[in-house]
């Protein structure tokens, strides 16, 4: 997303690399084209229970002249456990830890078969104010619990387009909300 001649990035992930644990980001980065550098703009606010939040798989739109609305995306804990499972399984196999191997193989086999609610995709509409560097929680909306959705603001309405309800299952739904 480009605002005020800067590019903002939230989400993504780093897969297992050279036997290192994967990384799921919990921050927003800003790229300054004048200096060709990335810097941390802000850390995402944690959930009310203190759990980490990520915008991996989420989407964002500019709002007014100096705000960004962030929505959707995967649950940090569920996603990190899934993408880290191969390295944990390899370590369990190297240690000949049969209990861990059995558990991790069962988790991998079951991962795509859980009900939608199990994945806990993000339902919070977050607003980040670039002027004050402050986050606002604009509420919980089940329609935002998507990964890979598109979003657009037009005529004072936020439109959320499609997205995954859970891994591998996309919805054709288009939802709108008046801002």
Language model regions located:
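Kelch-like beta-propeller repeat domains
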Residues: 1-179
């Amino acid at each position: 997303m480009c605002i005020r001649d800067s590019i903002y990035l939230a989400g993504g992930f780093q897969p297992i690399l050279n036997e290192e644990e994967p990384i799921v980001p919990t921050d927003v980065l800003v790229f300054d084209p004048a200096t060709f550098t990335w810097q941390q703009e802000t850390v995402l606010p944690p959930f009310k229970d203190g759990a980490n939040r990520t915008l991996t798989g989420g989407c964002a739109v500019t709002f007014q002249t100096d705000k960004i609305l962030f929505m959707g995306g995967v649950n940090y804990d569920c996603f990190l456990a899934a993408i880290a499972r191969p390295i944990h399984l390899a370590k369990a196999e190297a240690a000949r830890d049969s209990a861990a191997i059995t558990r991790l193989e069962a988790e991998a086999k079951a991962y795509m078969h859980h009900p939608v609610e199990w994945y806990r995709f993000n339902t919070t509409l977050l607003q980040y104010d670039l002027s004050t560097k402050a986050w606002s929680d604009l509420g919980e909306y089940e329609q935002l619990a998507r990964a890979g959705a598109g979003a657009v603001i037009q005529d004072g309405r936020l439109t959320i387009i499609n997205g995954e309800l859970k891994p591998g299952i996309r919805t054709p739904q288009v939802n709108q909300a008046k801002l």
